């Protein structure tokens, strides 16, 4: 490649040198500009700037769809967790309940195998403790960050108690029809989630909901600063609080999980009315 403009375009994507199987789009207007595999073997993408606007609209749609489906999801999860046997549906529902309550990552087998980082489906029993009426999680998350989460949801506490009785090191396992112990996978949980919700959503959408809710709550408590710089600082502080909940960097949290409408509403001084309309979700 010798064309100076093309070289500048490729360099601007800042694809890490460690990525393998990297491919670039020949068309500078194509929505997907680059794709490659990270050290864990996962595909990573670089998109055109205009495509990011489309993704933001889709994020808003998925968030609204999840909020609408929440009552149905909660009823189905409660029904499946009402049993006393560690069935497949019981274990899958328990993972959904955990992520909905704590917003931890779903889990990736490659990351667990390569560097011992954990998410919901790859948690070990040693990462999960019952402390009175609470479930306490302690594990190393993506990026090596030490995470500690505590949840007092009665359904989850009861489910963890039942699942701990299943032989094996993994936390979320079940016995199949033949009595064989099997660990759940993130793909299985996502499929189960779509089945009970009746819509196309994923576990990641719960993290978007949590991040947006934290930012909404944080910004609804403050009056927008008079200067643009001051407002940016207020937004950053709110995003940092959400990033802590998600064990993410503020930059990733803002880009991938926080709904732009919340920030815009805050900057325009109408967040109090916006917050009132979604109170209770």
PLM regions: where:
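A positively charged, amphipathic N-terminal helix/segment that binds anionic biomolecules
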Residues: 1-235, 239-246, 255
């Amino acid at each position: 490649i010798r064309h100076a403009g093309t070289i500048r375009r490729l360099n601007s994507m800042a694809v890490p040198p460690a990525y393998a199987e990297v491919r670039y789009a020949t068309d500078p207007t194509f929505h997907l500009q680059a794709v490659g595999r990270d050290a864990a073997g996962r595909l990573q993408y670089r998109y055109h700037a205009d495509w990011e606007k489309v993704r933001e609209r889709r994020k808003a749609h998925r968030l609204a769809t999840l909020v609408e489906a929440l009552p149905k999801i909660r009823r189905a999860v409660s029904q499946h967790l009402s049993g006393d046997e560690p069935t497949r549906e019981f274990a899958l529902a328990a993972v959904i309940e955990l992520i909905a309550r704590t917003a931890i990552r779903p889990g990736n087998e490659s990351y667990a195998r390569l560097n011992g980082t954990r998410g919901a489906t790859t948690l070990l029993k040693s990462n999960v403790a019952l402390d009175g009426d609470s479930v306490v999680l302690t594990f190393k998350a993506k990026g090596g960050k030490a995470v500690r989460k505590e949840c007092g949801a009665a359904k989850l506490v009861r489910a963890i108690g039942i699942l701990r009785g299943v032989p094996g090191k993994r936390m979320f396992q079940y016995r199949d029809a033949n009595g064989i112990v099997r660990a759940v996978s993130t793909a299985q949980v996502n499929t189960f989630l779509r089945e009970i919700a009746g819509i196309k959503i994923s576990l990641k959408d719960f993290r978007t909901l949590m991040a947006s809710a934290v930012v909404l709550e944080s910004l609804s408590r403050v009056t927008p600063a008079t200067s643009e710089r001051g407002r940016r600082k207020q937004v950053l502080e709110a995003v940092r609080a959400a990033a802590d909940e998600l064990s993410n960097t503020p930059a990733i949290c803002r880009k991938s999980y926080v709904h732009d409408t919340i920030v815009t509403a805050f900057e325009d001084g109408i967040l109090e009315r916006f917050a009132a309309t979604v109170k209770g979700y």
